[in-house]
């Protein structure tokens, strides 16, 4: 961990787990934000919105995200080895706009795969003063764990107004929207994505108390999910058996019934309570995985349990239903026990795309500290083969999982080199990242040759072609 960074404290981290956001004010001079604002206006007037290429066009934006305050906050919520994703966008809110409805963003390069555990985050940056009337972003704090609009709207709207340079980091699945612009000025908000490269093993914030205590600040949301919050807090601490303090005297049959309750809040609370209870409810939870309505909550329960349940889940990877196999593969990734590795490697050959996708992602979430070099080489080799899958969202997960393996992904250098020419831009990005993290002279040469060939020069325009 970079000790020089101003890290989040326990209270800030707990607030992020509950609320799903943290607001920052890096101390850059106003002139920097004014310069970025002018260059955004110039981009839009001359070239339109260049989307992902806004960063090489306006490299000062990188300076904003390199601020120690921002890096410290991202380190807290995403771990030391977080990475900036290659998707970014300038959201342009024009005068007179009516705003948006609340929504969750899709995952770039992947199918929708919401995570309660913070593996992805977004950052919103304002280069201009952004009062309410200019149409800032609004969020529903605490809504990141809810899938239905009805449940999300039980939470109160918070307007993210702010001075030039304001940055808000949010959990990727937080419900948010652009508000109506009632002013005569343009409002720009730059959205950048980040994701973690390593599951937590130790706290990456300034941790002093490992016990979960509800935050003391005034609640601005209307739900209370202390068992879920404690589970997520324990995961961020790197605790592999986070539920040792749960009261096991719950009526499990009643909890199972509540997985189909009308209230999403009740379904969620029951799922995490069942996960905390663990072993004795696992067979019943596995039986529920085939249900489209209840299965997602059973998956949450299984994934938030403890490694002692892994053998039962491994057996269920042979279930006749591909939906069950996919959900089991996902839960095994959340549990993170390396005894599941060989079985997840076999699941890469499943005929069902969603099983292959979940197995591919889960392989990137399981620690390599087991030290079985033969198994690590097999993992890298098989993930390299999946880079040829017909579905881009499986290839994207394969490249990202190889990037998470770091130097251990060296056996996949050849397929990663081919993936630099993939038809999907995000597969290309993750393949390049994987080569960077492999770090051998061969991987570095391949990467630099690719980057020099594909380099986009921000100084070259139709007015100045050479």
Which ranges hold each PLM region?
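Non-heme Fe(II)-dependent double-stranded beta-helix
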Residues: 1-113
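Catalytic core of non-heme Fe(II) oxygenases with the double-stranded beta-helix
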Residues: 98-161
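Conserved metal-binding segment of the jelly-roll/cupin
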Residues: 161-176
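Non-heme Fe(II)/2-oxoglutarate
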Residues: 179-257, 266-268, 278
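Amphipathic alpha-helical scaffolding segments comprising HEAT/armadillo-like alpha-solenoid repeats
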Residues: 247-260, 277-290, 307-318, 337-349, ...
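Alpha-helix N-cap/helix-start positions at coil->helix boundaries
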Residues: 264-265, 279, 291-296, 307, ...
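Alpha-solenoid HEAT/ARM repeat scaffold
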Residues: 268, 272, 283, 295-300, ...
